């Protein structure tokens, strides 16, 4: 199965018409993964026996015409729990964790009759921007195996970009869907906070985390979002907002005509690579040619986003990860003398360096005497950043800009420099702080590596982002470019 030459709708039509069976498609998917993943290293766990049984059952029942995802394989980031299928969060702490329940999104995909083929690699507990922080392996960029795939959803991004699957789920706390999507030349959406249930997502930063789809095209992404979105009684932060058929509206390649688009001057400031700037300016020209107005706007407090995020996110992480103590959950150390020994040794052995760094930062920020100076101040900065977005989006349909300051960097180049790594998320983090939807899509190339564009919208207005993304896609060909797997540029 050549996933580079099809899309979800075409594949579903072939399944309904019995040009291919769900079992044949699933088997071909596993064959392809086994051929390519020795180089890409996108997957941590495969679900072959259960997936083939599910595919056979779908074939026996007949692929439903009103289920646009029925019979189609999907990959899940390995911090989304799957009943009976190992879920590790790429951490030694959870190396042998077999969940006894499904995440809500896992259930929703099963109800849509998608077939989960496996779990993808990530930075440990989703903390990182390169997937190098995984305890188990380093995933490669599909376009160049010497480059990182981004993170923390690098495994899902690489799986889609390398043609192993047509669709995958990731999670985004500070850019972890959008940045790897940009680095791999695919489409990734961080939905509005609350659009998708977090029940069954192994928590990092509970006020920031969102699960979202990663696909090869905007329309496929929209189809996936409709399947996983909606209120969930298990997640009280999930919204009761109605979930439209996002893909149904994607028919007009000129749908941005008359729209006002904001392009923040801060998004093209020093530190953003020239090729990235040129790609975004060219995209702005494309929108102008389609009848939109593109205005220079300002998000003056954007520069404080990274600092605020690493205080808030790390504080929430230090609280969420308390449960992994060697007694209730997670790895338990051997040769311990007392209760304190259990805690110290289990956590020291189970967590990697980046997770430890963030736990310590978060614990410090929440400690007596420092709470007001750090956490409370970061929360106030968050409000200011939200107000900046609100002011711009009051007069503009959406905001556009780059996803990351540079294309994918080399494996090993930044892993020993946490501050440099953190600054790669300077353009995505503010969107999480504000709880807004952000769509990443291919917008160009720099020395053979993909450059991503980010569209940022009003709360629960993913529809406008999809329309704008679709219009751009239909008037360019960046999303049609595919990697010569691992070819160095």
UniProtKB/Swiss-Prot annotation:
Catalytic activity: L-glutamyl-tRNA(Gln) + L-glutamine + ATP + H2O = L-glutaminyl-tRNA(Gln) + L-glutamate + ADP + phosphate + H(+)
Keywords associated with the record: ATP-binding, Ligase, Nucleotide-binding, Protein biosynthesis
InterPro entries given in the database record: Amidase (IPR000120), Amidase_CS (IPR020556), Amidase_dom (IPR023631), AS_sf (IPR036928), GatA (IPR004412)
Domain of life of the organism encoding this protein: Bacteria
Annotated coiled-coil segments of the chain: none
Nucleotide-binding is among the record's keywords: yes
Cellular component annotations (GO), alphabetically ordered: glutamyl-tRNA(Gln) amidotransferase complex
A Pfam entry, by short name: Amidase
Similarity comment text for this entry: Belongs to the amidase family. GatA subfamily.
NCBIfam families: gatA (TIGR00132)
Name of the protein: Glutamyl-tRNA(Gln) amidotransferase subunit A
Species per Swiss-Prot/TrEMBL record: Levilactobacillus brevis (strain ATCC 367 / BCRC 12310 / CIP 105137 / JCM 1170 / LMG 11437 / NCIMB 947 / NCTC 947)
